[in-house]
């Protein structure tokens, strides 16, 4: 069954411009308070100009273009401008540092980068010292360095016509995006997302929260994340609604933004809920039009009840990951909700709990949450240039192994228990323990290292490092944290350090992590 009617992203935007015309499509608010608004017609024209910009710079169908940007209109222009000419977006987490960004550039085969002056010095260094296929950089800022191979995105875009100059044949099976996500290994994997995936995500997420064209969907989630793209942006645009993209989350500003834009839908992670709850009580706490707050793991029942009562909202639970594209298990429109259940399988999906031998388990028994979808349509297509990793999680018949532990009840409600893999959930970011351990292990004074997540009242989990030093060495906390800050993104830096004589291991030599939590 073809849910999207064979419609790729170029057709989608041309149709949206025709149908909704001067209706507001996109509102972007920067951290400095600058607000940009675009109608569906204007946004489609900006997307076309951006597509023409890329074509002028030599980008053709199948080429990869990296984006290292905070939330801004240019991200939206690039995302769909690239899709219109069959090129592929590679979004980079805006908080990553040089080594991590270099690795993604190299492994995605990106030949062009769009970024801002804030991140340019890092990429200038990458171009000079690291091997990559990067041949040009576009800066979204008006003031440019006097460097070769650097252009002004805005100036080039404004020189382009508002009609598309290059329209190669497109298929819904074509790749639209490669989104690198942290995994259980030390390196992120490139999740291949097709035009069909994105179109389906729009219809599915709009169905999940019963989105209408008079809705206003506000998000503070970063545009380089699947949540912002597929749960928020694609849903809003597919429904002809208004999408409000705020540059960065601020607990102090959030409810004011919800009220200012008359938002009817938003999305939250636990860190947001906890920081909102510690804000001073206000008479305006319930002065909003929100009917749904899309919510992602994990929150206690007490926290949930307190938040819902104070702000007069209800949470719509949704469970998924980058590989599932959308929240494949969740609360459904018109269906009962059963907290702390993560909901039931959505349309076009099957869900099971399986044991270690890949056999389905009955209700009430713990096992791995597994999802059945159609690769390249309702779930991701594959990991980019990584067939081994793909085969490890995705069976030939479309069953996806999430690596998460849970159970279901007799009525088909699923319950999330824990992450099977060594991942730390920190304020909405997934952090790989193995990745951090490999970085910290390069410190000359450290002999052995293990990283674990410990409970944190605000950010879900804090990161704690246990280290064993080389004989005769001493290591101060200042030296350790300084080393971490220089070698990993800020959100990955451990909060705690404990120096030990040894680490607990089993008979196979593997570290027993549970003994350290």
Swiss-Prot record:
Pfam families on file: AMP-binding, AMP-binding_C
Single GO MF descriptor: carnitine-CoA ligase activity
GO term, biological process aspect, one: fatty acid metabolic process
Catalysed reaction, written as an equation: 4-(trimethylamino)butanoate + ATP + CoA = 4-(trimethylamino)butanoyl-CoA + AMP + diphosphate; crotonobetaine + ATP + CoA = crotonobetainyl-CoA + AMP + diphosphate; (R)-carnitine + ATP + CoA = (R)-carnitinyl-CoA + AMP + diphosphate
Pathway: Amine and polyamine metabolism; carnitine metabolism
Enzyme class: ligase
Keywords, ordered alphabetically: Ligase
Cystine pairs: none
EC numbers: 6.2.1.48
Family designation: Belongs to the ATP-dependent AMP-binding enzyme family.
NCBIfam families per UniProt: PRK08008.1 (NF005947)
Role played: Catalyzes the transfer of CoA to carnitine, generating the initial carnitinyl-CoA needed for the CaiB reaction cycle. Also has activity toward crotonobetaine and gamma-butyrobetaine.
Protein name per UniProt: Crotonobetaine/carnitine--CoA ligase
Organism per entry: Escherichia coli O6:H1 (strain CFT073 / ATCC 700928 / UPEC)
């Amino acid at each position: 069954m073809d849910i999207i009617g064979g419609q790729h992203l170029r057709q989608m935007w041309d149709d949206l411009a025709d149908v909704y015309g001067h209706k507001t499509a996109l509102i972007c608010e920067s951290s400095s308070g600058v607000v940009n608004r675009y109608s569906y017609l204007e946004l489609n024209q900006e997307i076309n100009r951006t597509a023409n910009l890329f074509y002028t710079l030599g980008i053709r169908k199948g080429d990869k273009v990296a984006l290292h940007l905070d939330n801004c209109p240019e991200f939206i222009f690039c995302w769909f401008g690239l899709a219109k000419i069959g090129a592929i977006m590679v979004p980079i987490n805006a908080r990553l540092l040089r080594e991590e960004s270099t690795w993604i550039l190299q492994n995605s085969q990106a030949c062009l980068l769009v970024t801002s002056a804030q991140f340019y010095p890092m990429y200038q260094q990458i171009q000079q010292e690291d091997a990559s296929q990067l041949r040009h950089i576009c800066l979204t800022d008006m003031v440019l360095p006097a460097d070769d191979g650097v252009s002004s995105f805005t100036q080039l875009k404004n020189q382009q016509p508002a009609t598309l100059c290059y329209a190669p044949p497109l298929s819904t099976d074509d790749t639209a995006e490669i989104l690198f996500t942290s995994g259980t290994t030390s390196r992120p994997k490139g999740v291949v997302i097709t035009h069909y995936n994105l179109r389906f995500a729009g219809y599915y997420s709009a169905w999940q929260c019963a989105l209408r064209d008079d809705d206003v969907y506000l998000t503070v989630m970063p545009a380089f994340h699947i949540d912002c793209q597929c749960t928020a942006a694609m849903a809003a645009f597919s429904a002809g609604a208004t999408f409000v993209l705020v540059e960065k989350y601020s607990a102090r500003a959030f409810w004011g933004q919800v009220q200012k834009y008359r938002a009817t839908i938003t999305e939250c992670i636990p860190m947001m809920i906890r920081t909102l709850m510690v804000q001073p009580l206000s008479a305006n706490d319930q002065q909003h039009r929100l009917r749904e707050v899309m919510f992602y793991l994990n929150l206690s029942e007490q926290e949930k009840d307190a938040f819902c009562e104070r702000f007069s909202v209800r949470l719509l639970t949704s469970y998924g990951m980058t590989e599932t594209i959308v929240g494949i298990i969740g609360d459904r429109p018109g269906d009962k909700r059963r907290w702390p259940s993560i909901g039931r399988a959505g349309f076009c999906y099957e869900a099971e709990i399986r044991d270690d031998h890949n056999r389905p388990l009955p209700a009430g028994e713990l096992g791995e949450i597994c999802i059945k979808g159609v690769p390249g349509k309702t779930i991701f297509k594959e990991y980019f240039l990584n067939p081994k990793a793909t085969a490890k999680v995705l069976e030939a018949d479309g069953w996806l192994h999430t690596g998460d532990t849970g159970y279901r009840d007799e009525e088909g409600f699923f319950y999330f228990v824990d992450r099977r893999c060594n991942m730390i959930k920190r304020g909405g970011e997934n952090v790989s323990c193995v990745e951090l351990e490999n970085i910290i292990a390069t410190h000359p004074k450290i002999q052995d290292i293990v990283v674990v997540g410990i409970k944190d009242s605000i950010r879900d989990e804090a990161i704690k490092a246990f280290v064993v030093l080389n004989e005769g060495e001493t290591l101060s906390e200042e030296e350790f944290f300084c080393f971490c800050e220089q070698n990993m993104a800020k959100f990955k830096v451990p909060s705690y350090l404990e120096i030990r004589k040894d680490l607990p291991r089993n008979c196979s030599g593997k570290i027993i992590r549970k003994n350290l939590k």
